[in-house]
Curated annotation (Swiss-Prot):
Keywords: Aminoacyl-tRNA synthetase, ATP-binding, Cytoplasm, Ligase, Metal-binding, Nucleotide-binding, Protein biosynthesis, Zinc. Its EC number is 6.1.1.16. It comes from the Bacteria. The keyword Metal-binding applies. It holds the Pfam family DALR_2. This is Cysteine--tRNA ligase. One of its GO terms (biological process) is cysteinyl-tRNA aminoacylation. It is found in: Cytoplasm. Monomer.
C-alpha cells in the first residue's frame, strides 16, 4: 500500500484517491520570466517521478501543471527586455517545454495559463466577495485571512506569528488599503503602462494565489487528490490557495499535500535561487551534460530531501547510469547466442526484485531505496549474462524488468542502447585482456565479436590492444 507524507498532517498516510484507479494531481508550475534553473527543475522532475510511479502502479493520472504568465516579475522582465508580457511568456514557455522534454518529463495532461482564465478568476473573486471572504479597496480586492478558520494550518503557524511576519513585509500603500496585515491580494489595480484586464473593480490583473485555485479546480474539481510544489510554496502560496478554495466551494481542497526539498549549492549549502544569483539554468547545463544524466541525478534522491548540486554528484550519476546502460546493452548482445528455453529460478528472482522495488517506492516514493534494488537487479543481470550458456526467455525478462524499473526514474535504457562510447570500449578491452590472461579464449572471442558487430575493430599489438572504428 502506497503511503505519502502529507504536509498538512505532518505524517505518512495511506494513499486512497477519491476515484478508484484515477489520480487527480496538480503541480505548481513556473513563473515564465526566465529559463528554469536546477532548483526549479527539481520540483518538475520530482513530481514527474511520482507521476511515473503512480502510472507504474496502474493509476491513470490526470496531471495539471500551470504557467504563471502574468505577475510583478513578468512585468519587470518584459520591461527590461523591451518586449510585451505575452511575448516574454511565449519565449520562456517554449524554453520550458524544450528543457523539460530534454529531461524526459512527460507533458502535463493540461498546461493552463493564468491569462487564459481571467474570466474564471473574476467569477471566483466575485463569489468570495459575495460570501464575505473578500473586499474591494481602491481598485484592489483582498481576501480576509482571519475569516478562514483554518488559516495557518498547512504551514503550522499561529495567526499571531503570521501577523508579525506580514506586518514586516507590508508596504505603506498596502497598509492603507488592507483591513488586516494578514489579508492578501486577489486582484491588483493596474498601474500606468502595465498589462491589464477589465473587471467589476476596474482595470487590473489577478493576484498570484488566486490563479492556482481557479485553474486547479477548473480542471480537477473542488477536491484534488494531490497538490504538489516546492517547500517554499507552503506559505504563503499554498496556505492562501486552501483559504480561497475552501471558502468558495465549502469542500476540502486537497487530500494529500506534497512538497519537495531544495537544491543546494556551494560549501554553505545555500538554496539555489534566482534572487541569490547562485543558479545554473537547465538551458545552459544540458549543452555540457547529458540530459539523461541530469535527470537521473535529480530523480534518484527522495523528493522531500535536499539535493546538493556539484560536479562530483553529476559524475557519480553519469557513472551509475553508464553501468545500467552497459548492462542493458550486454543483455541485448547475449540474445544473439541465447538458446530457447525458460528458467523458473530467474522468474522467481525477478518477481522478488519487483516486490522489493514496490515496497521501497510505496514508502513515500523512497527512490533511494528503490534505485538500490535496481542496482541489485543490475548485478544479477551481469552475473547471468556472463554464463557460457544463456536462454533467450530469461534474458528478455531481465531486460524488460530492468527497463521498466529504470523508466520510473525517467530514463529510457533503450535510447542509444546500440551506441558505444570510448569508455565502454576500453572497459570491454580490459575485460577481454583479463579473459585472455586466464586463457578463457571463448569469452575473449565473444567480446571481440561483440565489438566488431558494433563497428569496432580490435588490433592486438606488442604494445597492447588498439581499436579503430570501421569505416562505412
Amino acid at each position: 500500500m502506497l503511503k505519502i507524507y502529507n504536509t498538512l498532517t505532518r505524517q505518512k498516510e495511506e494513499f486512497h484517491p477519491q476515484q478508484a484507479g484515477i489520480v487527480n494531481m496538480y503541480v505548481c508550475g513556473p513563473t515564465v520570466y526566465n529559463y528554469i534553473h536546477i532548483g526549479n527543475a527539481r520540483s518538475v522532475v520530482a513530481f514527474d517521478t511520482v507521476r511515473r510511479y503512480l502510472e507504474f502502479s496502474g493509476y491513470q493520472v490526470n496531471y495539471v501543471s500551470n504557467f504563471t504568465d502574468v505577475d510583478d516579475k513578468m512585468i519587470k522582465a518584459a520591461k527590461e527586455q523591451g518586449i510585451t508580457v505575452p511575448e516574454l511568456a511565449y519565449k520562456y514557455i517554449q524554453a520550458y517545454m524544450e528543457d523539460t522534454a530534454a529531461l524526459n518529463v512527460e507533458p502535463a495532461t493540461t498546461h493552463p495559463r493564468a491569462t487564459e482564465n481571467i474570466d474564471g478568476i473574476i467569477s471566483f473573486i466575485e463569489d468570495l466577495i459575495e460570501k464575505g471572504y473578500a473586499y474591494q479597496s481602491g481598485g484592489d480586492v483582498y481576501y480576509r485571512a482571519r475569516k478562514f478558520a483554518h488559516y495557518g494550518q498547512l504551514s503550522g503557524q499561529s495567526l499571531d506569528d503570521l501577523e508579525v511576519g506580514a506586518s514586516e513585509h507590508v508596504s505603506t500603500e498596502e497598509v492603507a488599503k488592507k483591513k488586516d496585515p494578514l489579508d492578501f491580494a486577489l486582484w491588483k489595480a493596474a498601474k500606468p503602462g502595465e498589462i491589464k484586464w477589465d473587471s467589476p473593480w476596474g482595470a487590473g490583473r489577478p493576484g498570484w494565489h488566486i490563479e492556482c485555485s481557479v485553474m486547479s479546480t477548473k480542471y480537477l474539481g473542488d477536491t484534488l487528490d494531490i497538490h504538489a510544489g516546492g517547500q517554499d510554496l507552503e506559505f504563503p502560496h499554498h496556505e492562501n490557495e486552501i483559504a480561497q478554495s475552501e471558502a468558495k466551494t465549502g469542500h476540502r481542497f486537497v487530500n494529500y499535500w506534497m512538497h519537495n526539498g531544495f537544491v543546494t549549492i556551494g560549501r554553505d549549502n545555500e538554496k539555489m535561487s534566482k534572487s541569490l544569483g547562485n543558479f545554473v539554468t537547465v538551458h545552459d547545463l544540458i549543452k555540457e551534460v547529458d540530459p539523461q544524466v541530469l535527470r537521473f541525478f535529480m530523480s534518484t534522491t527522495q523528493y522531500r530531501r535536499p539535493i546538493q548540486y556539484s560536479q562530483e554528484s553529476l559524475v557519480e550519476a553519469q557513472a551509475n547510469l553508464e553501468h545500467l546502460k552497459n548492462t542493458y546493452d550486454n543483455l541485448a548482445y547475449r540474445l544473439k547466442d541465447a538458446t530457447s528455453g525458460t528458467d523458473g529460478g530467474v522468474q522467481r528472482q525477478l518477481a522478488d526484485f519487483r516486490a522489493r522495488f514496490v515496497a521501497a517506492m510505496d514508502d513515500d516514493i523512497n527512490v533511494q531505496n528503490g534505485i538500490a534494488v535496481v542496482y541489485e537487479l543490475m548485478r544479477f543481470a551481469n552475473q547471468y549474462v556472463e554464463q557460457r550458456l544463456v536462454q533467450r526467455e530469461p534474458i528478455v525478462a531481465i531486460q524488460l524488468m530492468l527497463k521498466r524499473l529504470v523508466a520510473v526514474f525517467g530514463v529510457d535504457l533503450a535510447v542509444s542502447a546500440t551506441e558505444i562510447n570510448d569508455e565502454k570500449i576500453k572497459e570491454l578491452i580490459e575485460k577481454r585482456n583479463a579473459a585472455r590472461a586466464e586463457k578463457d579464449f571463448a569469452l575473449s572471442d565473444q567480446i571481440r565479436d561483440q565489438l566488431r558487430d558494433q563497428g569496432i575493430i580490435l588490433e592486438d599489438t606488442p604494445q597492447g590492444t588498439r581499436y579503430r572504428k570501421e569505416s562505412n
